[in-house]
Swiss-Prot record:
UniProt feature, compositional bias: Acidic residues: 160-187
Organism this protein belongs to: Arabidopsis thaliana (Mouse-ear cress)
Chain ranges of the UBA domain: 59-101, 109-150, 190-232
Function: Involved in de novo DNA methylation. Controls asymmetric and CpNpG methylation. Required for FWA gene silencing but not for the maintenance of SUP gene silencing. Functionally redundant to CMT3 to maintain non-CpG methylation. Involved in RNA-directed DNA methylation (RdDM). Acts as major DNA methyltransferase in the RdDM pathway, and is essential for RNA-directed de novo DNA methylation of cytosines in all sequence contexts. Associates with long non-coding RNA (lncRNA) produced by RNA polymerase V (Pol V).
Listed name of the protein: DNA (cytosine-5)-methyltransferase DRM2
């Protein structure tokens, strides 16, 4: 029996770009890791290129390296731990080893508590020592003000305050970086916080102009890691010349799959000349309990169903990606929706589909919309100065024990005060927002557990638990999944159309978000043909199918290449066709959180979108011809 748990932003679209030969996660991190704010333990030097090359030769995964780095661990300690434990151990073993190094360093340190406190906040050690000498070790507020003030800060531009970091409805979404130099906005010459961010970016190797423009563009609420995302993406795209020169249209690369589709004589529309803009608010054709509901749209005759199709991917992609996706899916514009209107967590996604949009309804019971509703036990410990009511997007990795310890260390000196100083509050809130931390005790912020993520995303309790799936795999699979309540709202229109059941072709199924949505809508699944490369994910769907007593047939393929045109036609002949083709190609090459291989639809994973198009074309041709 399935138990439902009812109790409880990657900021700018970058022009299409080509991946750099020097684009492994290890190399990219070496370029910018040394002075990241909030690093767990200061290091004397970075891993050498030879050392990181050795890690690759040992067979260590770039993706795991990137995950460990994003959790706040220094590159030197990651490299040391990998060499000690070997490349093939669980990520948790490597984390435990790094934690041991951290404890040893702290035990042998002779630095004062004040120095440790501000080093943990990411300030430069030399400046911390100087500030303590000037103001005294006990005057923490004066030390903080000194560290946050510098001559450069007096001449740096202030950030523009915008909702969620960036106002996506701005008219300059599609403009180039030259616009940043021509802003007429009023500048605050005394932005100490922004000055600190810019100094950190300069130490990481960016120019002062690049850093200040990034801060101005991304907004004052953006943390250092997200600013680095923006700058690294632009550098890898070789687009920094656009800070200074007029934009020149570049011809995108076309891989074999793209040429295959574009060589069929499909007309090229003006969509490339009119970039798709992300709406604010991101509510698509409407969401429950919000104004602005749209109940009618026009679709090209060729695009109308049945069969129906539903394609999902991340909203914040490199520039030009959604135009390309739309062009290959009958010129249908995407419906952009942020799942914060359906649950407690944000999740900005784009959906291209040919479903009706009238008479949508929400599955019951509705999810929890606020943090305190979703986590009622946290309310007792929630500081008044933490004003969050929503969580950010669910990530594929989670905050480390060292991070939560740094937060505890930062707060404990102020236990007898009404609240900590503003600079401590800012640091803690930044980390809580980045890693979706919730308060579980006094000075104790903790990352979400997998079962809590399942509830937020609309899955049944224990959906990903057991069956050979590790915690790391659970985080990754949940972070890449559908938000079930959002998808179910869109698919709800199918219930009256298929009262006796539906045949589904599910591509890149993951942990079965689409299937869970249909089940919760009480739409009978007569047939599901699923394509999913991960064995543990396939097992999760199979377990769900059995536990919910589905009477239809589940057929699973492990590789999209196995679903040949002949195979598809054979399945359609046997089962009578498909009513819905649902899926979303792997988005690792599109997601803003991916600093290294964010290469748009040219990426090895994201190019699988063209396989979605191939299969949809076969299904539609067969059903239209029958």
């Amino acid at each position: 029996m399935v138990i439902w748990n009812n109790d409880d932003d990657d900021f700018l679209e970058i022009d299409n770009f080509q991946s750099s030969p020097r684009s492994s996660p290890i190399h990219a991190m070496q370029c910018r890791v040394e002075n990241l704010a909030g690093v767990a333990v200061t290091t004397s030097s970075l891993s050498s290129p030879t050392e990181t090359t050795d890690l690759v030769q040992m067979g260590f995964s770039d993706e795991v390296f990137a995950t460990l780095f994003d959790m706040g661990f220094p590159v030197e300690m990651i490299s040391r731990a990998i060499k000690e434990t070997g490349p093939n151990v669980e990520t948790s073993v490597i984390i435990d080893t790094i934690s041991k190094y951290s404890s040893d360093c702290e035990a042998g340190s002779s630095k004062s508590k004040a120095i440790d406190h501000f080093l943990a906040m990411g300030f430069d050690e030399e400046k911390v020592v100087k500030a303590i000498q000037e103001h005294g070790e006990d005057n923490m507020e004066a030390i903080a003000n000194a560290l946050l003030s510098c001559p450069e800060a007096k001449k740096l531009p202030a950030a523009v305050e915008e909702e969620d970091g960036i106002d996506w409805s701005s008219s300059d979404d599609d403009t180039n970086y030259t616009d940043m130099l021509n802003s007429d906005d009023e500048k605050d010459p005394n932005s100490n916080e922004n000055g600190s961010k810019i100094r950190s970016l300069v130490k990481m190797g960016f120019s002062e102009l690049e850093a200040s423009l990034a801060v101005e563009r991304c907004g004052e609420n953006v943390d250092i890691a997200e600013l680095t995302d923006f700058l690294c993406a632009a550098q890898m795209a070789r687009e920094f010349s656009e800070f200074y020169t007029e934009h020149e249209e570049q011809k995108p690369r076309h891989n074999i799959k793209k040429r295959r589709f574009e060589s069929k004589g499909e007309p090229r529309s003006s969509v490339d000349d009119e970039p798709i803009r992300l709406p604010n608010p991101m509510i698509g054709f409407g969401v429950p309990n919000e104004p602005g509901l749209i109940t009618h749209r026009s679709l090209p005759e060729l695009a109308r169903g049945p069969p129906f199709f539903y394609y999902e991917n991340v909203a914040l992609t490199p520039k030009g990606v959604w135009e390309t996706i739309s062009r290959h899916l009958f010129e249908i514009p995407p419906e952009f929706v942020d799942s914060k209107y359906f649950c407690v967590a944000a999740r900005k996604r784009g959906y291209i589909h040919n479903l009706p949009i009238n008479n949508r309804f929400q599955i019951q019971p509705p999810p929890k919309y606020t943090i305190h509703d979703a986590f009622p036990l946290s309310k007792r410990w929630w500081p008044e100065w933490d004003k969050r009511t929503k969580l950010n997007c669910i990530l594929t990795c989670t905050g480390s024990a060292q991070l939560t310890n740094r937060i505890r260390v930062a707060l404990e000196p102020y236990n007898e005060e009404p609240e900590p100083p503003k600079h401590v509050q800012r640091y803690v809130i930044d980390q809580c927002k980045k890693w979706n931390l919730v308060w579980v005790g006094k000075n104790k912020a903790a990352p979400l557990e997998p079962d809590e993520m399942e509830s937020i995303l609309g899955f049944p309790k224990n959906h990903t638990r057991g069956g050979g799936m590790s915690r790391t795999e659970r985080f990754k699979s949940l972070g890449n999944s559908f938000q079930v309540d959002t998808v179910a709202y869109h698919l709800s229109v199918l219930k009256p159309i298929f009262p006796h059941g539906i045949n589904v072709l599910s591509l890149f199924t993951g942990i079965g978000g689409g299937e869970v949505a249909l089940h919760r809508l009480q739409i009978k699944m007569k047939l599901v043909v699923s394509v999913e490369i991960s064995k543990v994910n396939r097992n999760i769907l199979k377990d769900f199918w059995e536990q919910t007593n589905q009477t239809g047939e589940l057929i699973e393929f492990s590789d999209i290449q196995h679903l040949t045109n002949d195979t598809i036609e054979g399945l359609m002949e046997k089962y009578g066709g498909f009513d819905l083709v649902i899926g979303g190609s792997p988005c690792n090459n599109l997601a803003g959180g991916n600093r290294v291989s964010r290469v748009g639809l040219e990426g090895d994973q994201s190019s699988l979108f063209f396989e979605y198009c191939r299969i949809l074309e076969v299904v539609r041709a067969r059903m239209r011809g029958s």
